[in-house]
């Protein structure tokens, strides 16, 4: 099974069926965004990620479906998600199971931080 996994993007060559089974396919990609819920999403931001994914897939149309090409798409999406975070369209989930500031420390006013330690830097 071909796949690409980054911190916030999982892409699989195949589909998930109604009974929650995965069926590998060479003609369909499945995208899972932020599977660990590290970020706080709104519908508009998610739609931007899905639209960017569709654009990237279209750019690769006609090329071989390889792990390398999937990684390029996943990496580009990861950078796109980082840009959404930096623009304030999404935010870190400070109540998440495992806070990991993999895209840089949160940019929020200190008075809004309750029970969280964020080093000055």
UniProtKB/Swiss-Prot annotation:
Annotated catalysed reactions: a plastoquinone + NADH + (n+1) H(+)(in) = a plastoquinol + NAD(+) + n H(+)(out); a plastoquinone + NADPH + (n+1) H(+)(in) = a plastoquinol + NADP(+) + n H(+)(out)
GO MF, one example: oxidoreductase activity, acting on NAD(P)H, quinone or similar compound as acceptor
GO terms under cellular component: plasma membrane-derived thylakoid membrane
InterPro entries on file: NdhM
Name of the protein: NAD(P)H-quinone oxidoreductase subunit M
UniProt record similarity statement: Belongs to the complex I NdhM subunit family.
Job description of the protein: NDH-1 shuttles electrons from an unknown electron donor, via FMN and iron-sulfur (Fe-S) centers, to quinones in the respiratory and/or the photosynthetic chain. The immediate electron acceptor for the enzyme in this species is believed to be plastoquinone. Couples the redox reaction to proton translocation, and thus conserves the redox energy in a proton gradient. Cyanobacterial NDH-1 also plays a role in inorganic carbon-concentration.
Top EC class of this enzyme: translocase
Topology of the protein relative to the lipid bilayer: Peripheral membrane protein
Subcellular location(s) per record: Cellular thylakoid membrane
UniProt keywords, alphabetically: Membrane, NAD, NADP, Plastoquinone, Quinone, Thylakoid, Translocase, Transport
The protein's assembly and partners: NDH-1 can be composed of about 15 different subunits; different subcomplexes with different compositions have been identified which probably have different functions.
Keyword match NADP: yes
The protein's Enzyme Commission number: 7.1.1.-
């Amino acid at each position: 099974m071909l796949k690409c996994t980054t911190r916030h993007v999982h892409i699989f060559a195949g589909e998930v069926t109604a009974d929650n089974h995965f069926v590998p396919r060479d003609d369909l990609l499945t995208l899972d965004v932020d599977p660990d819920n590290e970020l706080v999403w709104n519908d508009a931001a998610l739609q931007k990620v899905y639209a960017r994914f569709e654009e990237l897939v279209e750019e690769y149309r006609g090329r071989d479906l390889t792990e390398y090409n999937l990684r390029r798409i996943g990496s580009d999406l990861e950078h796109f998600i980082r840009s959404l975070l930096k623009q304030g369209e999404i935010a870190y989930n400070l109540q998440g199971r495992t806070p990991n500031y993999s895209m840089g420390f949160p940019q929020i006013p200190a008075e809004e931080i309750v029970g969280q330690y964020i080093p000055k830097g």
